[in-house]
Amino acid sequence: MLHEPHASSTQETQLLYGHCAEVLGTDGLWLNVRGPDGYEGWMHDGYTAPSELDKFIKWAWDIESEISMGCSVRDSRGATLDLPLGAVIGDGHVIAGRALDMAHRRATFPPTADAIVASTTALFQGTYYQWGGITPWGADCSGMLQSIFALHGIHLLRDAWQQATQGAAVDCSLEDARPADLLFFSDREDGHITHVAMAIGGSQAVHIALGRGGHCLESFSQPDDYTRALAGRFRFARRIVA
């Protein structure tokens, strides 16, 4: 999903294979769409296929059928598709990698703090920073956390400043935050939230950051120059998982 209806526009977020969106308007072959999280942007018609209204699913992560954990599928036409974490398998047949239906996703990825921390540190390890990305193929800070929490059955909004309105306020320092608490940062004078990380315990956090090139673990008890600067921008924490 792009900011404006042309190919050189900035990517705002992503809609994955099999996910639904509402069409708000058109500009030639470009569609102005609203995703399941309320985010709006532009997509070219070539990336879309019509869907019956009664089949519209607000959150594709909640469907009963299989979702990719990172796999390759062969579709009904015999074409091979590589699908990232979160894409819907649909009528495809998995030929490599893994896909899980709802029952197996809920059993494998429960909505608990320890499980969420494990997924965030493992599934996005090695991911590079990509503005607007939401998958291990490239993600930004809030995109990674939105996808991870969705995998565990918890819906977060898209941007860091929006996620900062969710859950419960927590009065704690960076060192005292509990595993899976969201940590919010700002580099603006008005305090507007511009970055989010997740506490993993032991005075550590995991995030995707441009300054690190992507996925990274930070230690606030043994900081380097980057981590000290990051800590200076800390504003508050929110607890999503009780």
Task: Please provide the spans of the model-predicted regions.
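Core beta-strand residues in small-molecule sensory/regulatory alpha/beta domains
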Residues: 2-4, 74, 186
